[in-house]
Amino acid sequence: MRLSSICRLVLVLGLAITSFVACSRDPNVRKQKYFESGQRYFDKEKYREASIQFGNAVQVDPRFAQGHYRLAQSFLKLQQWTRAYQELNRTVELDPENYQARVDLANLLIAGHDLKQAQEHIDLLLSKQPNDPQVHEAIANLLSAQQDFPAAIKEIQKSISLGPDRWEAYLNLALLQMRTNQMDAAEGNLKKAVQLNPQAMNAQLALGGYYQARNRLTEAEEQYRRAINVDAKSPDPRAALAKLYLAEGKRSETEEFLKQVKRDLPENSVGYRMLGDFYFATGDLDKATAEYGMLYSEHPKDVQVKKNYVQLLILKNRLDEARKLNDELLKANPNDNEALVYRGQIQIRDGHANEATQTLQTALKNDPDSGVAHFHLGLAFDQLGNLARAESEWRDAVRWRPELVEAHRALAAAALRRGDMDALEQSAKQVLDLQPLSPDGYALRAVSNIARKRFAPAEEDIHKAIEVAPQSPVGYVQMGNLKLVQKQFVEAEKAYQQALEKDPRSTDALGGLMNTYLAQNQPDKAVATANSQISKVSNSSAFYDLLGTVLLNNKKDMKGAEAALKKAAELDKNNSDALLKLGRVQVAKGATDEAIATYQNSIKNNPNEASFYILMGELYESKKDWQKAKDAYQKALDLKPDNPLASNNLAYVMLETGGNVDVALSLAQTARRGMPDSPNAADTLGWVLYQKGAYQSAIDLFQEALKLAEKTKAPEDATVHYHLGLAYEKAEKPTLARQHLERVLKINPNYSAADDVRKALAQLKS
């Protein structure tokens, strides 16, 4: 009996274990476990974790429509729009009757300005769900995107009539009414939304934002405090209240309030990060970095804290620390897009722009909508000298992230480089809209107006820049620039000095003050001013650069210029401007080999600076070291393929060394396109055409070179006359040939090809 009982027990246990193993391998069970886990994370607002679990569910069953839909909702919460779109699309493919997914898809397409495709989904929804209030809300969104606000309001009102208890509809109606300046009606509907769902934080905050926009600041503060009471654990109303304080100029109150938020929400990542984010947003990188360093030590497992700390370390140029922490992030998740963007930033700062483009393009393959990745990819292309591609990336950045102010600043800088003042004004307006309390937008718009001699609006913007940021040098520098252009030197001097009082390290202020003295032919005063400021700020590479420039260009003091520029380079090995000028000084004093050594050392710290290779090539050319000159120019073109100066010089060297004439022609044409006003570019292209036997075309270009030199008041170039004389000889115009060949020897009796000139003249006489 006992043996039989034991056998039965073993049999039962065996069956139970078999059943358990079978269940654990059942794909439907596994799918459901992942789905339920994802739902729990979603309910706790842990959307990244939810997306992983929903992703696991659809990996087990790729046709699990509800899993795809919940994954889409997670991506929407994470603002990963492309992936959300893909999952919504997959949802309606698998379950065409999931009309809520179609509504979400239509709204996402509207947000992405794909109105045609959105209309197709809305047409289907109207035919299938004509009385669904959310369908009419989507129609209202579409009409709003088409700027038809009256029709949009009618649709949202229809949505309310179909679903009068939906607080979201009242909120959307209020937002539309605010856009059409129906402010009183908007207030009523915002209050209705709050009444219908007091827990709806979006409605609570929208009402506070309404009061703030109407400058009813006391009511705004009261509303935000009510929102805090509604959900004491939510960081959102606290963030809104902090922004209100900041908008009122209550910086110290904001700081103290956020310190309290950190104490109130010790377990909420958004809450305890607010203080560090405040320091970052207000430009206090030292405090922000210190705060995040402390947060990282307190919350080492908080990935967002770690990421924000990495970003701050990059901005502080503490690259080794940033690299170490970021490598840890990528080791944990090689496809972490934020960490890939950080790696790209580090590579840019290391001067490895080519590597940065590869890293950032990988990030964009994972998330094509990443405005931040587009922005930094633009910086990498800019470092490589590809401004057109850089601007394209920056435009993509602001398309996906319109609030990304740094991308608007980059576009402003690009417009300034191109001399496109209309584009600069547009970018300045974007900066102003995003940061009305920053002086930068006003200053940029002032720059565009000064360039177009619109002095009155420029001065108005400058006064506004000073008003919003009286402790910043930005407004005072622009006031100095305006007065300098107007030749009001006393006022210019005063403005620049005020800027230096606000920020003794301001290179723009010191440079402007020195230019004011130079404009009055007072170089000694400019030098004295530079030395005076250097005595206050002794570690500024830029200040020594300014001093060296005046000593070189205005005082012709080669020894003093060399000492100042060497100090500038010593303080900042990446100061390419100082290094380039240092080489020029060394060339001027006849130390060609020393200049070459300077450029070679400079390249080690600035490997992507094509100018060093071009100048080095010119020095090798002067030594008749053709191969090294050729290699240097080619390296410059590897970095900047369309660089006109490198193209011109390489074409000329190829002709001098018997290189491929067709390749030289292509290079010379590139140079001519890039430098249409350059006598040298016209001469080089003419010389290539001479080699190809197109003598009349060559003559036209040599004549153009002479005209351009005369126009720019450049000294007569014996080489152009030599080339023109030879071309006239080939064109059988001996009188003109003799005239230009004789001119060569008058300009420079010791011309390098003087013997060939005399030989040609002798042949013409015979």
Per-segment meaning from a language model:
Residues 1-5:
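N-terminal secretory signal peptides that target proteins for export/translocation
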Residues 6-766:
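Alpha-solenoid helical repeat scaffolds
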